[in-house]
Amino acid sequence: MSKKPKYKTALIGTGRIGFTLGFDRKREQPASHTMALRKNRRIKFVAACDNNQLRLDHFRRFVKKTITFADCSNMFATDKFDIIVIAVNENSHLDVTLDAIRAKPKLIILEKPVALCVADALKIQEEAEKYKIPILVNHERRFAQDYKIAKKYIDSIGELISVNARLDSGLRVYTPSEENSGAYSLLHDGTHLVDIVSYLLEEENDLSDLESKILYNMKLNNIVFDKEKSDVVRFVSASFESLKCPNVNINISGKSKFFGFEIDVIGTLGRIRIGNGIFEFYKREESKLYSGFYSLEKDLKVKRPKKTKYFSNMVKNAVDFLDGKAELKSNLQTGINTLRILEDIKNQLKNELL
């Protein structure tokens, strides 16, 4: 049997998601691109780039066999890579991704969100199609075992009545002054919330149609502005429809004193609650409280996975794709669809600020 090839890989960005989250002892590991790449035996991690010398020095002390660069163009000029991973800040996605596409790797892994705005994302798409470069977008929950279980279980809870998704943090939801940086939660973490709701509601073969947003007919329900800064949004609630569910609610708080991420899916025969630290599945059973009624009871047959493998499964999907064994589970088009939904919300917020 011939030996399977290793894919030569380069990383751009050695910050939190690129590198340092791999040292967070409370997080499920691997939690960074560096750790996930190093864990996969089919990856040959040969180069890394960062324009911050302190970060690069820290990275070099840990990953000693990887050649480091302060400039992407120099890195691209020295070698030909199978995979290029882009883990830079949102405001650098467009330029860095265009440069990476022109370096002609076999695959690009791009951190979420695709770009600051849909217009930038479409420029990336146009260049990717020109050079025929596939792009995997790291909306990590699409690769997580717990969400895979939830997606499969949805078919057993009957007709969907409602989906309520919530993100809580202390980061502003939106302000026009940060639009060029992406430093607001609607984009930064809201992309995870909207994307995973889309994942749960989309069909398995629904990944190819760019114009097909899973959520549509948006209505803004409530907005709360900062008490001192009138151009800062601290809370937004928006409702949507989808083919699978007529009532989808997205709530994002930027005034919470904690970080929370959860989704509550209610059907005619059951319920799913899933999120950070949450894994609950309910099914319809004869009621223990009332004669002639049914209640929802926890489905004890559904076991929480010991590890979700969200990051390692993402890298595995990249390898399987290059091997010709699998399609990308989170591609450029699903990423753009998510960005379109976020932009719908953002544009409504901008109208309210006028």
Where on the chain are the PLM-derived regions?
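Acidic-histidine catalytic/liganding microenvironments
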Residues: 40, 63, 78-79, 144, ...
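A contiguous active-site-proximal alpha/beta segment in oxidoreductase catalytic domains
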Residues: 115-176
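Beta-loop-alpha module in the N-terminal Rossmann-like domain of NAD(P)-dependent dehydrogenases
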Residues: 54, 63-127
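C-terminal helix-rich "cap/oligomerization" subdomain common to oxidoreductases
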Residues: 1-6, 83-85, 316-354
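N-terminal Rossmann-like dinucleotide-binding module
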Residues: 1-62
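NAD(P)-dinucleotide binding in Rossmann-like oxidoreductases
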Residues: 243-314
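Rossmann-like dinucleotide-binding domain that binds NAD(P)(H)
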Residues: 173-258, 333
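Short active-site oxyanion
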Residues: 43-47, 82-84, 184
